[in-house]
């Protein structure tokens, strides 16, 4: 049977509240034991049978019940005093304070001032003289040999507690009872003893200087995380880490939960358009700060320049023509990374020109929406883009009878939702996309009403008839190709169909 040992606590799958030191101060194999389940443990079982060192090797060090799950450890880890008793019924007070790194042991009967005396008498006991230390699988030389001082041992105890406190927000505190022993050991124990294996393979010390070195090294984990954070993308849904190099090949879909993460406009163009067929339009069109918007934090022009350097784009939308499985299409893709995909005068003008070009060339149109709405730095000029784009779409759809598909990604809000985002002949949404006109916080502050959770998510809105299908990214290109062919748009070369 495997025994988890950590000074004043024993671990065997779940945390056991009723224990003091892992080994008795006065006799081998007899743990100082706390037999109470209250917040302030007291001694209430004077006849508790505790296995001695003469028991078989398969016996457990602990003869206690599983009283408190690991998730309740926060209740007694910070600053507590335990009243415990060894097999000789000698009472001890064990006090520890994590914040101040205090660990004290007092004997209630004889008021021993130096705990080292107890260890000295223990090491010279008759048991140690009669029984071979190396033959006893429960003998831990790192704790009881004289060259390892009591101070180092206590420092190890406090260090392990502190290391646990740092990791206390991990999954170990969830409501699940299916705890993995190794997982608990990793975060709490710092050392392990297995009574069925030899000493050379089963004893791991936490009492020497290497444990303190490990603690110091762990303090640099945050710096290491910051150094390599650019290599990983964290999922917004499950908070799992996805390796950035592989994420693009997986269409920016989380490998842990399948959540559709945000994609750049360039990645979406690469996903939908056949290689070598992309022809961009109006790439040199940039905003000139038409209303001379003043900001205390950063001038509008400087902010535009910073996003241009950051994304490599000139504005929050890319427009152009290309082929989708051999079918010529006009496509505009908004990029949320550029000022939240906000729609200003340049964005509206580029989309309007794209629609007019598709009208003249009789091309099917795709607009991929990812926007926070109208750009406030351009005032009413940004608001008028809603009407301008809608007017161009009216001519495209009603007069020319051409086919327009709107793809709503996360997030699609504000003026984009109120204009061309909802004007498609077919409106497609990505799974779990956030789609709304006004955000949850704006609605709650304006109407003083609570917005239900999930009421602005694609799956909920689908049942309300807000759009047509919800299509994941994997089959999206094939779905678009079938829709175009259904509406009499065919590839120029039949052999180019993939």
Curated annotation (Swiss-Prot):
**Which keywords fit this entry according to its UniProt record?**
ATP-binding, Chloroplast, Fatty acid biosynthesis, Fatty acid metabolism, Lipid biosynthesis, Lipid metabolism, Metal-binding, Nucleotide-binding, Plastid, Transferase, Zinc, Zinc-finger
- The EC number of this protein is 2.1.3.15
InterPro entries hit by this protein: AcCoA_carboxyl_beta, Acetyl_CoA_COase_Trfase_b_su, ClpP/crotonase-like_dom_sf, COA_CT_N
Pfam families documented for this protein = Carboxyl_trans (PF01039)
Q: Where are the zinc fingers (C4-type)?
A: 235-257
Q: Does the keyword Calcium apply?
A: no
The record's catalysed reaction(s) read:
N(6)-carboxybiotinyl-L-lysyl-[protein] + acetyl-CoA = N(6)-biotinyl-L-lysyl-[protein] + malonyl-CoA
Which GO molecular function terms does the record list?
A: acetyl-CoA carboxylase activity; ATP binding; carboxyl- or carbamoyltransferase activity; zinc ion binding
CoA carboxyltransferase N-terminal domain spans which residues? 231-498
Where's it found, cell-wise?
A: Plastid, Chloroplast stroma
Cofactor(s) essential for the protein? Zn(2+)
> Where does this protein act, in terms of pathway?
Lipid metabolism; malonyl-CoA biosynthesis; malonyl-CoA from acetyl-CoA: step 1/1
Q: Where does Zn(2+) bind?
A: 235, 238, 254, 257
Q: Is S-adenosyl-L-methionine among the key words of this record?
A: no
Q: SUPFAM superfamilies, alphabetically?
A: ClpP/crotonase
Q: Which BP terms from GO are recorded?
A: fatty acid biosynthetic process; malonyl-CoA biosynthetic process
Q: Which NCBIfam families match?
A: accD (TIGR00515)
Q: Which HAMAP family match?
A: AcetylCoA_CT_beta
| Name of the protein in question | Acetyl-coenzyme A carboxylase carboxyl transferase subunit beta, chloroplastic
Native species: Morus indica (Mulberry)
What gene name is given for the protein in this entry? accD
